Amino acid sequence: MRRRYALILGLLVLFCLAAFAVLFGEEVFQNYTAKTQRNIELKAHHEFIQSLRKNSSRLGAFSTDGCSGGLSRAWWTLSDRFPAFAKTHEKAPPWETCCLNHDRSYHSAGGATESHESFSLRLSADQALRTCILGTGRRRSADLSATFGLSEDQIRSAYEAIASAMFDAVRIGRLPCIGLPWRWGYGYPPCAVTIVPN
């Protein structure tokens, strides 16, 4: 019964947000959404920083899975099984160094000591990931264009889609204190927070 009410409430919220966007315009809606997301996320960053202070947490050894979500692992498997794939697309995702740099920032939470700083550093790390992937697309566009018979603009568009999807995935799924292994600040002991807007 609770699930049904939660579903109905969720649909009602989505309907209200859509109506808000139509009535007040896309820009106002995006600003409202960004502000709401920031407020929700800042609570998680506050809890994270408080947990670090309270527990005198020390940073653990760096570890990474490459590009998260199983992307690197799947890529490695494809490369091993299909040498032509590896020849064209490399043995690891061409943007894997972007993911490794991103993981380094996430591991240490960028060295943040305040919640607003933590929020800003996380956003900067996610934007740097997106920018790095786009740069990889620009560097590879001529070669891939010749290989696949597509225009360089089409190749860059594909990389824009990849960069946007990865940016959205890390923005949504890697908040601090959510218990996932590759969360913001994953080099520190886990903390927990109930993320509910005020």
Regions found by a protein language model. Give the residues of each.
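Extended terminal accessory/targeting regions
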Residues: Y5-G10, A18-N198
